[in-house]
C-alpha cells in the first residue's frame, strides 16, 4: 500500500487578540509612512480586556494621532459592542513610543559598505536594521503557489469574517480560528482534506446545532473544493461547546505572535522574525518578502515544483551574508545556478529591496490579517510574477 502523510496548518481571524495587535501596529506604521515615507518604525502592541498598550521606537517628524488610529482599527475589525469586553470607543489606549536608538540608526542610515567611501552606490547607503535569517517559499499546490493547508485555513476565516460583516450570519463575533489537515500521496501531492477545525466566537443565543450547520454549509463547503472532500472528512466545529467570551476579553494579544500564520503554516522554515509594525529597513520584514518574491518566480518559471529561499544579513551591512535556495529535488536546474541567477536579478540590499518592491508606501495594514504571502485579494508587489522570463534566461 502506498504511503500517505498528513500535514496541518492553522489560521486566525482579524478578531483574534494577536491579530488585533498586529493590525494596530501596521495601521500605525501606515499612518506614519503616509506622512513620512522615510520614517523608521518599530511599533509593538499589547491588547487585553478594555486596554491597548502601544510601545516601541520611531524616528519621524510626522505627527500621527495614535489614539485615533487604534480606535479606528478596532472598529474596522468589528469590536464596537461593549458586551464584547473590548470596544473601540471605550478601550483605554496607552501609547509609549520613543526615538530609535542612535547606535542602531547609524548602521541603518550609513551601511558598512559606504563608510569612508567617496565612490558610493546609493543602494549601499542603507544597512540591514538587524542581523538575522529570513525564508521565502513557494510550491505548485495551489494557483497562488502556496501550501494547500495554509491557503485553505486563511480562506475559511476570511469567509467567516465576510459572513459576519455582511450580516448573513448575524450571531457571529470577531474572534475565530481555523485548522486544516491535508492528506498527501506518495508523490507529495495533496489528495484530500482529512480534518477541518473551526472555532468561532458567537452570541450567547446561538445554538451549537445552528453554528455547526451554518459553518458546514456556508463556510467549509463554500471554501474547500468538493474534490478534496469525501465522506471520511472530519469536521470539528466549536468543539469546546461554547465560545461566547473571546477576543482580548478571553486572551491577551501581542504583536508578532502569529508568525507561522503570517507565512506558510509551518510547511516551510521560518527565521523567527515578525513583520507587523516594522518599516522596510527591518529585514525581518522586507527580506522575507523578497525571499517569497524569488521563490514564487522560480516555481512560476517551471524551474522547480517547490522552492525555499534563505537570506541572511549582518546589522549595518547592506549586502546579504548568504543566499541559499533549496528545491527539495524538484528543480530542473542546479540550485547553484538558481542562487547565482537570484543574485543577478534581484537586488537584495535593503535599499534595493525597498526600491524593487516599492516598500515606502502605506501598504502594510492590509497584510496584517489572513497572511502576508499568497494573497489573491490584494495587489502585493512580492506576489507578482514579473521575473519569470529573466530567471529562465539566466539559467539557460
From Swiss-Prot:
Reactions mediated catalytically: L-methionine + ATP + H2O = S-adenosyl-L-methionine + phosphate + diphosphate
InterPro entries: ADOMET_SYNTHASE_CS (IPR022631), S-AdoMet_synt_C (IPR022630), S-AdoMet_synt_central (IPR022629), S-AdoMet_synt_N (IPR022628), S-AdoMet_synthetase (IPR002133), S-AdoMet_synthetase_sfam (IPR022636)
Binding residues for L-methionine: 57, 100, 251, 282
Binding site for ATP: 16, 175-177, 242-243, 251, 257-258, 274, 278
Pfam families given in the database record: S-AdoMet_synt_C, S-AdoMet_synt_M, S-AdoMet_synt_N
Sequence positions that bind Mg(2+): 18
Major location category of this protein: cytoplasm
GO molecular function, one term: ATP binding
Entry keyword annotation includes Metal-binding: yes
Keywords in alphabetical order: ATP-binding, Cytoplasm, Magnesium, Metal-binding, Nucleotide-binding, One-carbon metabolism, Potassium, Transferase
Region named Flexible loop: 100-110
Localization terms from the record: Cytoplasm
Domain of life from the UniProt record: Bacteria
Protein EC: 2.5.1.6
Binding residues annotated for K(+), in chain numbering: 44
Pathway as given in its UniProt record: Amino-acid biosynthesis; S-adenosyl-L-methionine biosynthesis; S-adenosyl-L-methionine from L-methionine: step 1/1
Annotated PROSITE patterns: ADOMET_SYNTHASE_1, ADOMET_SYNTHASE_2
Cofactor(s), names only, from the UniProt record: Mg(2+); K(+)
GO biological process, one term: one-carbon metabolic process
Family as reported in the entry's similarity comment: Belongs to the AdoMet synthase family.
Entries under HAMAP family matching the protein: S_AdoMet_synth1 (MF_00086)
Subunit note: Homotetramer; dimer of dimers.
Name this polypeptide is given: S-adenosylmethionine synthase
UniProt source species: Streptococcus pneumoniae (strain P1031)
